[in-house]
Amino acid sequence: MTLQHTPLNAIHRSLGARMVDFGGWDMPVNYGSQIEEHHAVRRDAGIFDVSHMCVVDLTGARVRDFLRGLLANNIDKLQTPGKALYTCMLNPKGGVIDDLIVYFFREDWFRLVVNAGTAPTDIEWITAQNAAAGTGVAITPRRSDNNAGAEPLGIVAVQGPNARAKAYAALPGTQAVGEALKPFNAGFATIDGVGEIMVARTGYTGEDGFELVVPAAQIAGVWERLLQAGVRPCGLGARDTLRLEAGMNLYGQDMDEHVSPLDAGLAWTVDLQSERDFNGKAALAANGQRDQFVGLLLRDKGGVLRAHQKVITAAGDGEITSGTFSPSLSQSIALARLPKDVAIGADVQVEIRDRRLTATVVKLPFVRNGKALVS
């Protein structure tokens, strides 16, 4: 199978990145040291190419009506232009088709950012739902592989305690917009030599920063300017350890179409209180929450917590969904789905190869804004 390339592929290779197949995309896993890249984001500023993710513009007079039924979170929370919302898109059984961010810019224009591997099926699902609802929404993917004639867009994420300041230095024109943005808000800035870009105060690391949506033809110049300002290039390896420390789900690993958001720690993204109906609402109401989604800290030596390891508790067995060695905490951590009756602070046993090692159940996240929240 031929791998897809982002507009920054040649630059990654010129920087000596180790490239891997990530959901059919040729992506950098690191540029030499995953640990150093991780620490750069926690302590200073790092940049990630996330152009494999897909921007989808939804336009038309009835977009809001359409999204009321498509998304589990309540789109009516978005009343101020630029405001963003994290939500799941569910199937009729209440399983997660994808998790995404939706931005509101005008009553006739909302923007979704969906995951890389799910983008084709997401677009098929959205198209089918639009046809069934008769809402007449125009659906315009903006990724380079499926933009249907619209200008393709790329995305870079600049993350870390110094990310915003370095972005302002690298890209004059972003400061006036960026300083006015609260978290989970976005605006547009015009950059000399680049044109208009979207500046979103969002991320997937547990640190402050921006995600910049840039015309694909200009994104290499934006990347180079940020590197010149002292932002370190970071790969998918560091992105994974950062998001895991921040207690953030990874689609396909921590949840999928067979998992309810209520069992994936995402109840806060589901609005069951409003009168509106949405895909999966009846199933969620009928089934309720069956499991809890928590963190694990490995106490014993001699192993690393990894996905699919069995967790043995007094209330029954659970499973690790994501696990790693935490560079910030210098110990192994995991996200796990456990029976609801297991208490925070309880010790559990994790099967690692032919051994059972002790881990402690903790509330997520492990790390946020450079600070350890567990011990």
From Swiss-Prot:
<dbReference type="GO" id="GO:0019464">
    <property type="term" value="P:glycine decarboxylation via glycine cleavage system"/>
</dbReference>
<dbReference type="InterPro" id="IPR022903">
    <property type="entry name" value="GCS_T_bac"/>
</dbReference>
<comment type="subunit">
    <text>The glycine cleavage system is composed of four proteins: P, T, L and H.</text>
</comment>
<dbReference type="InterPro" id="IPR006222">
    <property type="entry name" value="GCV_T_N"/>
</dbReference>
<keyword id="KW-0808">Transferase</keyword>
<dbReference type="Pfam" id="PF01571">
    <property type="entry name" value="GCV_T"/>
</dbReference>
<protein>
    <recommendedName>
        <fullName>Aminomethyltransferase</fullName>
        <ecNumber>2.1.2.10</ecNumber>
    </recommendedName>
</protein>
<dbReference type="GO" id="GO:0005960">
    <property type="term" value="C:glycine cleavage complex"/>
</dbReference>
<dbReference type="InterPro" id="IPR029043">
    <property type="entry name" value="GcvT/YgfZ_C"/>
</dbReference>
<dbReference type="Pfam" id="PF08669">
    <property type="entry name" value="GCV_T_C"/>
</dbReference>
<dbReference type="GO" id="GO:0008483">
    <property type="term" value="F:transaminase activity"/>
</dbReference>
<dbReference type="InterPro" id="IPR027266">
    <property type="entry name" value="TrmE/GcvT_dom1"/>
</dbReference>
<dbReference type="GO" id="GO:0004047">
    <property type="term" value="F:aminomethyltransferase activity"/>
</dbReference>
<keyword id="KW-0032">Aminotransferase</keyword>
<comment type="similarity">
    <text>Belongs to the GcvT family.</text>
</comment>
<dbReference type="InterPro" id="IPR013977">
    <property type="entry name" value="GCST_C"/>
</dbReference>
<dbReference type="InterPro" id="IPR006223">
    <property type="entry name" value="GCS_T"/>
</dbReference>
<dbReference type="InterPro" id="IPR028896">
    <property type="entry name" value="GcvT/YgfZ/DmdA"/>
</dbReference>
<dbReference type="GO" id="GO:0005829">
    <property type="term" value="C:cytosol"/>
</dbReference>
<comment type="function">
    <text>The glycine cleavage system catalyzes the degradation of glycine.</text>
</comment>
